[in-house]
Amino acid sequence: MREEKQLLKQEIIDKIQRYPAFVIMQYAGLTANQANDFRRQLGKIGGDVEVVRKRVLLKAAKDAGLELDVSSLNGHIGLVFLGEDPIEATKTVFKFSQEREKIIQVLGGRFDGQIYSGDDVEKLSKLPSKDEMRAQFLSTLEAPMAQTLAVVEALLASVAYCLDNKSKQGSEEPENSASEA
């Protein structure tokens, strides 16, 4: 293997080991502007794209301890390394693909050390992102507290209303008893 390919292979191995998740994509008809736009969108959320030859990818995966299905790897291949929130980055990949007439096809991916097919990766992309899950969790925690607070406020308001009525009744009684005498 030539020195350039060795360096590329080592770079791929380093990224496979550094990133907890990645997606293997096939692209066709992707222009330079579209590729730059894709890289920019992924860069905003901590992702990275690496275009790689099939042989280099297979050797790098083997050296990194991964077994990839060779039969699904056809055409131009790229790796999308997903940042801290792999679901959000995967959503970005599928959104980009759908907006541009599916010029990117996801062949598979790795999440938390597990290899998934393209269909499974698409299903994972439909899950809520970490931020969405945090918001759902906090709203789940907040709802009972908000309801409890509303009940306590209603009780305090009713106690205040009762005391106000009692004080009004107390101030009216001396006038009534004075008029009877």
Swiss-Prot record:
* InterPro entries membership: Ribosomal_uL10 (IPR001790), Ribosomal_uL10-like_sf (IPR043141), Ribosomal_uL10_bac (IPR022973), Ribosomal_uL10_bac_type (IPR047865)
Q: Which UniProt keywords are given for this protein, alphabetically ordered?
A: Ribonucleoprotein, Ribosomal protein, RNA-binding, rRNA-binding
The cross-references to SUPFAM superfamilies, in alphabetical order and at most eight, read: Ribosomal protein L10-like
A single Gene Ontology CC annotation of this entry is: ribosome
Example of a GO MF term? large ribosomal subunit rRNA binding
Q: Which domain of life is it from?
A: Bacteria
Please provide the Gene Ontology terms (biological process) for this protein.
translation
- Which Pfam families does UniProt cross-reference here? Ribosomal_L10 (PF00466)
Described purpose of this protein according to its UniProt entry: Forms part of the ribosomal stalk, playing a central role in the interaction of the ribosome with GTP-bound translation factors.
State the similarity comment.
Answer: Belongs to the universal ribosomal protein uL10 family.
Under HAMAP family, the record lists: Ribosomal_uL10
Quaternary structure and partners: Part of the ribosomal stalk of the 50S ribosomal subunit. The N-terminus interacts with L11 and the large rRNA to form the base of the stalk. The C-terminus forms an elongated spine to which L12 dimers bind in a sequential fashion forming a multimeric L10(L12)X complex.
What PANTHER family does the annotation carry? 39S RIBOSOMAL PROTEIN L10, MITOCHONDRIAL (PTHR11560)
Its name, as the record gives it, is Large ribosomal subunit protein uL10
Q: What is the lineage of its organism?
A: Bacteria, Pseudomonadati, Chlamydiota, Chlamydiia, Parachlamydiales
